[in-house]
C-alpha cells in the first residue's frame, strides 16, 4: 500500500511519500519537486504541471491556473467575481449554479467544473507518484486551508474522487506543518507536564494562516487558528504590477492591463523581482523585450521602495497574530518557538513584522515549501495499516461555530442550539435528544457569518424520517448524533428513536423522568463528562471520536456512561426500551449529485485515454522525424562508403520528401500512418545499415574464429609431438579434429578472399552471424575431444579391508549396527587422514 501526502497549493503542488527510510518529497518528469497548479487544454490533448506553465503566455485563454479559491462557490459569489477580474480565462455559470471554467478543448468550447479541473491536477500528481513508487497509488491525504468551509471541503473531496484517489483525510495545512514539526521532536514534555506552545505561520501565494499548537510527548493539540484568506504572495506581486503599469503608461504611453498576454509577462517578471529583492537591498532592474507594440520596457526597484509600496499589506500581518494569542489565552512569554513556512514568509518585511510582534527570533527549521506535503504523508502513514509509525495523536479544531435550528411545536416557533463552538476540538461527535411526534428537519448553519469567508451561512438541512408518536400518544424520544468528522465536515451521522415497551402487569406507580431530576443528574455528571471528552481527544480517527449528549433545549446532559446506567434503571422500573435507527435525508449546500460526479469521473477517464492515444500518435510521428534526421546525418558520415552515388541520390530524395510530408500533409495523421511510413523508410535504410554493421563487426568475428583455429592447431601439434598432456586422446578422434580444423581454415580463407574482392557497397559474401555460427560449431566439435580429462590412476585397496571380511555380524547383532560401526571407523580414518595432510 502506498502512502502519499499531497500539498494542493494555489500556485504549486508538492508530493511526499513515506518509505522505509522516512518521508521523501518526490520529483516529477522534469526532475522538479514542485509541480505548478496549472492545466492547459489544446486541440488534441492536455498539458498539466510544468508543461502547462510554459503555455500560460502562449495559450492564454485555455490555460487554467489560480482556481483553488473557486471550490464550492456559486458563480455569483463575490469572491468568484473578484477572481474573475484577475483571471485571463473565462468563467462560466454551471447548470447547478456553481462556478466553472470555459475553455476550448478538442476543437470545441467546453465548460469544466472546478472539481473536474482540480481532478485533472490530482490525476497528474497521482501519475507522478506512481512513476516514482513503481506501484499503484490510491490512498492519500490532501491539504486544504484551515479556513475552508464545508462546501469547499466537500468540493475538494469530490475532486479527489474524480482523480481516482481515496482521500483518507483532508488535513488543514497548518496542522500538517505542526505534525511535520512535532513527530520528530524527542525533547517534548511528558503528558503530565506543561505543554510546549509553538506558533506556526504560513503565508503562501494566496492566503495567510496562523496556528497555535500545544505539544506533549506523542500528542499534538491545536489551541487556536486565525487567518486572512485574502493576503498572500500574489498581493505583493499585484502591488508591483500596478506600480509598473502606471509607470509604463506614463513613460511609454501603453496600457498594459488591456493586453492579457503582456500583463501575464509582467506578473512573471514582478514575481522574479520580488524574490530577488528578498536577497538584495540595492536597486534591481526590470527589463522586458518586445513587451507591447514591439516596445522594450525597463525600470528598477529596490527593497525600501517595495516595502513602502506594500505598507498596507504589511499592516495586515499583525492582526491574525494578535487574534490567535487572544483565542488561545496565551501571552508572548508562553510561546516556545515561532515557525514560519510558505513562500511569502521569505519577504524580509514580513519576517520583521512577525519578530516585532513576538519580540523573539523566528525559526526556519522547517522546509518552507515542502513542510505541508511532508505532514500530510506522515498523517497518511499514521492512518495506513501498512506502516508502523511512532504513536502520535492529533487533535484539530472547528474553525467556525455551528448551530442547529429546528421547528418547535409552538406556532411559527423554532429552536436553536450551538452544537460546536469556535475552536471546539475535532473530530468530535455529539448526541442531541428531541421529543417529537412526527418527522422533523434540522438546519445546520454557521453561527457568526461575519467570521466566515463565505457568503452563505447554510451548511445543509437534514430531515429525520419515520418519527411517530408512542403507543400511548406521547412524543417519541429521538436521539440525533451530529459529528464533525476527520475531514472537518459537519454531518448528522445517525438518528434513533427510543421506543418504550411496557412489561406485563401494572406499572402505573413507576416514577417518571422529570425535568427536575434531569437537571439534578446533570450537575452530578458534568465533571465526569468533561474528563471523558479530554481523554477522547487523544485519538484522531473518526470512529474513535468522543461524544457528548445535549438536550434539545441546548443544555448539556449526561455522559454516555451515565446515560446507559439511567436507561438500565428505567428499564427495571418502567419496562423494556428499544432503540430503532431512523433514515436521514440530507440536503447539503453546494453538494455535487452522485450522477453528476459519476459523469465527471467518466469524462476524466476519457480525457486520460485521449491523452494516451495522442502521446502514442506523437511518439510515432516523432519516430519518423527522428529517423529522417538521423539517417540523413549518417549518410553524410558513416554510411557514405556503403551506398552508391545513384542510391544516395534516390534515398536523399525520399528523406526530403518525407520531411516535407511531415510538415504538410503528414502534420496531422493517425498513428498507423506514421508507423507505416517508418517501415517504408526502413526498407531503404536497413540494407545500408546492415552493410555498415557487418563491416564493423566482421573483423572481430574473423579474429575470434582465427584464434580458436590456432588454439586447436597447437593442441594437435603437441599431440603429434607425444606431449604427455594429450597422450590419453584417441587417435581416431584426433584425426577427426584435424579434418575439422582443415575444413574450417579452408572455409575461412575462401570467404575472406571472396569478401576482399567485393566493394563496400555490395552485399557481403559471409555474414557475421555465419562466422559466429562456424566458431560455435568448431567449439562444440573440438573442445570435448581435445579437453578430455586424463583418467585417474587406480588407488590400491587398503589391507585392513581384508581383515574386515571376518568382522561380520555376530549372533544377536544386526547388520545395521555393524554398518554404523564401520561408518564410525571410516569417519575416524578420514579425520586421521585429514590431520596427516595438515601436518
UniProtKB/Swiss-Prot annotation:
GO molecular function annotation: adenyl-nucleotide exchange factor activity; ATP binding; ATP-dependent protein folding chaperone
Major location category of this protein: cytoplasm
One GO term of the biological process aspect: protein folding
Gene3D superfamilies: 1.20.1270.10, 3.30.30.30, 3.30.420.40, Actin, Chain A, domain 4, Substrate Binding Domain Of DNAk, Chain A, domain 1
Modified residues (Phosphothreonine): 545, 761
Regions annotated as coiled coil: none
Basic and acidic residues bias spans: 503-554, 791-804, 818-839
Superkingdom of origin organism: Eukaryota
Subcellular location: Cytoplasm; Nucleus
TM region positions: none
InterPro entries noted in UniProt: ATPase_NBD (IPR043129), Heat_shock_70_CS (IPR018181), HSP70_C_sf (IPR029048), HSP70_peptide-bd_sf (IPR029047), Hsp_70_fam (IPR013126), HSPA4L_NBD (IPR042708)
Protein family according to the UniProt entry: Belongs to the heat shock protein 70 family.
Functional description taken from the UniProt entry: Possesses chaperone activity in vitro where it inhibits aggregation of citrate synthase.
Assembly and interaction partners: Homodimer.
Protein name: Heat shock 70 kDa protein 4L
Lineage: Eukaryota, Metazoa, Chordata, Craniata, Vertebrata
Gene: HSPA4L
Amino acid at each position: 500500500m502506498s502512502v502519499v501526502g499531497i500539498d494542493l497549493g494555489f500556485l504549486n503542488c508538492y508530493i511526499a511519500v513515506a518509505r522505509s527510510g522516512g518521508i521523501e518529497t518526490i520529483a516529477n518528469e522534469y526532475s522538479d519537486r514542485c509541480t505548478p497548479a496549472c492545466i492547459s487544454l489544446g486541440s488534441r490533448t492536455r498539458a498539466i504541471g510544468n508543461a502547462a506553465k510554459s503555455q500560460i503566455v502562449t495559450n492564454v485563454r485555455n490555460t487554467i491556473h489560480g482556481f483553488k479559491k473557486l471550490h464550492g462557490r456559486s458563480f455569483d459569489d463575490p469572491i468568484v467575481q473578484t477572481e474573475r477580474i484577475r483571471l485571463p480565462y473565462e468563467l462560466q455559470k454551471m447548470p447547478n449554479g456553481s462556478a466553472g471554467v470555459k475553455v476550448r478543448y478538442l476543437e470545441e468550447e467546453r465548460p469544466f467544473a472546478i472539481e473536474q479541473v482540480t481532478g485533472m491536477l490530482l490525476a497528474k500528481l497521482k501519475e507522478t507518484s506512481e512513476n516514482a513508487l513503481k506501484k499503484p497509488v490510491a490512498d492519500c491525504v490532501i491539504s486544504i486551508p484551515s479556513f475552508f468551509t464545508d462546501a469547499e471541503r466537500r468540493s475538494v473531496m469530490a475532486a479527489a474522487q474524480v482523480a481516482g484517489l481515496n482521500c483518507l483525510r483532508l488535513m488543514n495545512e497548518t496542522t500538517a506543518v505542526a505534525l511535520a514539526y512535532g513527530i520528530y521532536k524527542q525533547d517534548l514534555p511528558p503528558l503530565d507536564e506543561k505543554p510546549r506552545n509553538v506558533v506556526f505561520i504560513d503565508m503562501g501565494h494566496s492566503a495567510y494562516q496562523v496556528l497555535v499548537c500545544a505539544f506533549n510527548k506523542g500528542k499534538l493539540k491545536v489551541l487556536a487558528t486565525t487567518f486572512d484568506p485574502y493576503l498572500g504572495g500574489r498581493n505583493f506581486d499585484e502591488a508591483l504590477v500596478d506600480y509598473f503599469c502606471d509607470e509604463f503608461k506614463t513613460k511609454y504611453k501603453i496600457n498594459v492591463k488591456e493586453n492579457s498576454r503582456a500583463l501575464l509577462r509582467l506578473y512573471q517578471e514582478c514575481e522574479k523581482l520580488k524574490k530577488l529583492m528578498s536577497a538584495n537591498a540595492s536597486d534591481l532592474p526590470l527589463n522586458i523585450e518586445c513587451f507591447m507594440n514591439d516596445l522594450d520596457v525597463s525600470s528598477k526597484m529596490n527593497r525600501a521602495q517595495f516595502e513602502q509600496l506594500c505598507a498596507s499589506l504589511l499592516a495586515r500581518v499583525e492582526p491574525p497574530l494578535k487574534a490567535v494569542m487572544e483565542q488561545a489565552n496565551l501571552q508572548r512569554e508562553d510561546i516556545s518557538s515561532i515557525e514560519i513556512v510558505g513562500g511569502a514568509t521569505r519577504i524580509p518585511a514580513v519576517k520583521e513584522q512577525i519578530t516585532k510582534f513576538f519580540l523573539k527570533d523566528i525559526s526556519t527549521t522547517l522546509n518552507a515549501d515542502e513542510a505541508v506535503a511532508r505532514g500530510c504523508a506522515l498523517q497518511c502513514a499514521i492512518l495506513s495499516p501498512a506502516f508502523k509509525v511512532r504513536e502520535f495523536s492529533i487533535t484539530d479544531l472547528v474553525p467556525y461555530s455551528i448551530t442547529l435550528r429546528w421547528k418547535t411545536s409552538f406556532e411559527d416557533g423554532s429552536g436553536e442550539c450551538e452544537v460546536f463552538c469556535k475552536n471546539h476540538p475535532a473530530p468530535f461527535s455529539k448526541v442531541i435528544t428531541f421529543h417529537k411526534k412526527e418527522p422533523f428537519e434540522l438546519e445546520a448553519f454557521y453561527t457568526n457569518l461575519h467570521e466566515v469567508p463565505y457568503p452563505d451561512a447554510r451548511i445543509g438541512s437534514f430531515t429525520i424520517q419515520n418519527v411517530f408518536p408512542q403507543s400511548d400518544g406521547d412524543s417519541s424520544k429521538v436521539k440525533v448524533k451530529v459529528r464533525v468528522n476527520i475531514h472537518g465536515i459537519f454531518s448528522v451521522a445517525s438518528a434513533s428513536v427510543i421506543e418504550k415497551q411496557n412489561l406485563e402487569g401494572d406499572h402505573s406507580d413507576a416514577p417518571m423522568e422529570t425535568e427536575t431530576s434531569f437537571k439534578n443528574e446533570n450537575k452530578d455528571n458534568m465533571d465526569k463528562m468533561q474528563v471523558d471528552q479530554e481523554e477522547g481527544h487523544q485519538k484522531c480517527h473518526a470512529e474513535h471520536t468522543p461524544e457528548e449528549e445535549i438536550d434539545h433545549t441546548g443544555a448539556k446532559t449526561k455522559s454516555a456512561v451515565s446515560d446507559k446506567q439511567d436507561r438500565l434503571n428505567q428499564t427495571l422500573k418502567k419496562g423494556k426500551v428499544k432503540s430503532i435507527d431512523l433514515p436521514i435525508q440530507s440536503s447539503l449546500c453546494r453538494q455535487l449529485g452522485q450522477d453528476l460526479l459519476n459523469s465527471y469521473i467518466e469524462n476524466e477517464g476519457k480525457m486520460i485515454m485521449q491523452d494516451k492515444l495522442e502521446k502514442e500518435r506523437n511518439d510515432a510521428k516523432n519516430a519518423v522525424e527522428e529517423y529522417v534526421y538521423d539517417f540523413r546525418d549518417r549518410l553524410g558520415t558513416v554510411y557514405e562508403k556503403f551506398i552508391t552515388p545513384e542510391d544516395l541520390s534516390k534515398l536523399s530524395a525520399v528523406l526530403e520528401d518525407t520531411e516535407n510530408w511531415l510538415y504538410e500533409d503528414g502534420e496531422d495523421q493517425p498513428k498507423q500512418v506514421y508507423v507505416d511510413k517508418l517501415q517504408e523508410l526502413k526498407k531503404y535504410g536497413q540494407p545500408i545499415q546492415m552493410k555498415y554493421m557487418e563491416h564493423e563487426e566482421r573483423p572481430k568475428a574473423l579474429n575470434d574464429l582465427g584464434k580458436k583455429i590456432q588454439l586447436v592447431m597447437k593442441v594437435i601439434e603437441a599431440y603429434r609431438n607425444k606431449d604427455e598432456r594429450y597422450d590419453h586422446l584417441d587417435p581416431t578422434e584426433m584425426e577427426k579434429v584435424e579434418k575439422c580444423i582443415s575444413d574450417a581454415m579452408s572455409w575461412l580463407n575462401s570467404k575472406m578472399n571472396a569478401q576482399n574482392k567485393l566493394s563496400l557497397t555490395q552485399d557481403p559474401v559471409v555474414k557475421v552471424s555465419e562466422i559466429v555460427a562456424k566458431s560455435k560449431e568448431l567449439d562444440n566439435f573440438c573442445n570435448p575431444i581435445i579437453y578430455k580429462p586424463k583418467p585417474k590412476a587406480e588407488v590400491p585397496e587398503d589391507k585392513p579391508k581384508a581383515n574386515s571380511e571376518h568382522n561380520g555380524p555376530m549372533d544377536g547383532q544386526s547388520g545395521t549396527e555393524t554398518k554404523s560401526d564401520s561408518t564410525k571407523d571410516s569417519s575416524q580414518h578420514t579425520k586421521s587422514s585429514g590431520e596427516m595432510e595438515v601436518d
